[in-house]
């Protein structure tokens, strides 16, 4: 029967421990969407759309070049709905309040409170109601504030789109600005630099269009999009050059495109649906505190019936025995645990908020401290998500100012839209050099970029009788129109030997994760008229410019600090292995053997788990790869954090014990995260880890103190009940003692923590807690029994007529020893000398001890059935407490050496 009750309680724990602060919007096929990767049907549909020509796309989606009219829009919207992404829906406040209340201890305390009320023990019922109420409200208020702050961050990059629509009955059309939720499949939209892609699109016209897809793919550099595919056999929709996906951003250029999918039917929508519908399993904090809770509840369920049976059998008054057993049950239940946990977490959240960190879920604070593996995306998380000019070299790989200045003139004088590479080149030259170059060279003409040539040229003149054509573009395209190279200052033919040297240098740059662009030139006699493509011939290859998305300045020190704190960092990125390895090298992370997404497709969970343990860098991963790796690392017993900012990171953010999103993250990433960093500095990660460990240490102090003290008290009660002709303490005394002790614990969230307790990840360990109870609980029982002997033999309180004196004597010893244990157990060091508690805790425990001594002498003594103690009692009290502290310190030293100290 006991096992059945235990199983039921365990089930209750798993269901009711702190839950996320949201409820899910139901979607069609939600279970299949949440449980699988992007459906094959969606991939097939995207590939089919990519393969269509413009007329086929118009027919397939019911649109036409002049735009849809109002009737057509409503008809299509009736089928596909608004262009809105399925999202998590905030709970009503009353549901949130219920979720904050329904943890096992609150439910258990409520039952005990109702029993106390039914037996007219209003004092106990009131105390219990107060504890439950404070805990619930603290949790409710703090999480509501955090959620409100997180909601305030949700702002789309652009909430309108430029759409061609029929505007009157005459069939006239115009470009109009509409909220993106009003788009429907078949709409014709116009794109320009800076626009967010408002839906899934098929490009039908494009000019110099580059789109940043890092939020979906992890690819740090923008990709080109065109109207006619250059790779019709492409089987990955995200790499199709005629498709654009919702949530990505136009970096440069212009385009017109047809809407092919909206809302939940988009690629973004499918990922969002997966995240919204996936019911997250309990995280490490919830599981850990659940196991500890079960240990304490089991202990209470075993000891309370024993106390009832012994007292009922020896005293003969079963009703009195039942009331006493109920008081013992209340005393054994750590009713302050929910409040201590919540207030400690809330204090951690407040401290982190001063570091501009939003903590959406309070239990994420402790998970921060328990985290032993941090998986992180690369682009925009570790890196700046900004392209910079890294190298400018001649063909031998030596730094060349000539190449830099030629590239600058090309980027400066071109009149087309300047892409990110042009911006990086322009920023790579200081202002003085830029003024000198622009003053020295005048523009003559240009040959614009196009996708067939994949290069662009400008013609400049320093002297009136000579023009210089400067061309930059993709390496192979420049080689195709070059016949010579500048080598060690000389012009030499581009032969096979030189070509091998060029390949060797550029391959080395590529292996460093750099994107290489070639620069070439030639001198021409001055002439009138325009320059044409045919003039891009017989060029001299000057060298290369190479680009990189560099790490944030704080990345390397942050990762170093995390490593020093015992946290293993793993990179999970959708970018190429070469680029990712370069970033790892830049931030001081040993990448080792790189694993790419295609390598893990056919691995079993056990094989991948083994691989994940020893691998630092994973590249070319899909969102589902990231989620799977995080889940398997958790299965191996690790507490896993994931840090990311893109759409492709959302499933992994949800799967992790602690999801961390960074500044500038997309909405879906913020929504899936537990913690949001508002500062670009990643050093706040280390602050969060330390705060999490400090929070855990303070929570564990309360649990250890309460568990060991309660174990000792119950053991003492059992001994006294077996041999005394009266109750060793009245139920009222137990409740008052428990209340006063609990009051002294209110300051624990403000306590100091020893340095050694925050040097490595901390985890819940019920076995260690049980062992701790067995070691330290009986110490208090030894001195309780000495107190029994003192009161019985020295003060002759050994008859029912003198039981009040006996109970008063034990009440004071029990309260003071219980309160002193706070200072003994809060540190492995010598208390008050090597480690001192924070002043709020010293003040609170001092006040409670003073009140405990004064209570038997106060006017309330008669009401509380206590009596004044003789002065001769107090030297004995000092001796008992001193002995208790000395023995506890000795046992603590042995325990710490043998088992360690959390």
Name the predicted role of every residue range.
Residues 99-118, 132, 136, 158-159, ...:
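Alpha-helical transmembrane segments of multi-pass membrane proteins
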Residues 64, 243-251, 367-541, 547, ...:
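Cytosolic catalytic regions of ATP/NTP-dependent phosphoryl-transfer enzymes
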Residues 284-294, 325-329, 360-368, 693-705, ...:
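Membrane-interface segments at loop-to-transmembrane junctions
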